[in-house]
């Protein structure tokens, strides 16, 4: 039941982000949350605090990378909950050609309904290939 509810919530939150509204995502963040996106591409880094996460999300929306949820597994007590989210992310160029198509897993820790930390695992070579494409074809999107 908990996983079902978590999937409904996260699916709605991600649908809002796809629509350009990051407020629901930020509402789930604890003020001192931490977010890690491994790799060596323009998306990679360790981000601390809601404001840092907001800037990362603003770029995601500005660039137009889309995310969706396939499955959520959630467990634990309200003061020490873990959520694992499996989904996909993609980006189409202006001609409608799918340039980026990736799978991800998010491992998140929550306390009282707020995300305190999460890490995204995905094929970082695909993220680098997106960077390479944007640098060659859409350089304005590379600006942070």
Residue ranges of each PLM-predicted region?
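Preference for short coil/turn "hinge" residues that link or interrupt alpha-helices
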Residues: 19-21, 26, 40, 93, ...
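A solvent-exposed, acidic/Ser-Thr-rich amphipathic alpha-helical stretch
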Residues: 23-76
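Short, low-complexity N-terminal intrinsically disordered segments enriched in polar/charged residues
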Residues: 1-31, 136-144
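A general structural signal for well-ordered alpha-helical segments in protein cores
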Residues: 10, 53, 82-83
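A beta-strand edge to alpha-helix "cap/lid" segment located at domain peripheries
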Residues: 1-5, 58-144
């Amino acid at each position: 039941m908990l996983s079902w509810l978590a999937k409904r919530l996260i699916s709605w939150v991600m649908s809002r982000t796809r629509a350009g509204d990051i407020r629901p995502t930020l509402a789930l963040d604890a003020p001192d949350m931490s977010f890690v996106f491994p790799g060596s591409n323009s998306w990679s880094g360790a981000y601390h605090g809601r404001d840092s996460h907001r800037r990362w999300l603003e770029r995601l929306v500005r660039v137009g990378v889309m995310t969706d949820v396939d499955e959520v597994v959630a467990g634990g007590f309200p003061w020490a909950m873990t959520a694992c989210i499996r989904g996909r992310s993609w980006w189409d160029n202006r001609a409608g050609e799918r340039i980026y198509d990736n799978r991800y897993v998010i491992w998140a820790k929550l306390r009282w309904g707020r995300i305190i930390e999460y890490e995204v695992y995905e094929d970082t070579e695909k993220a680098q290939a997106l960077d390479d494409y944007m640098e060659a074809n859409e350089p304005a999107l590379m600006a942070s």
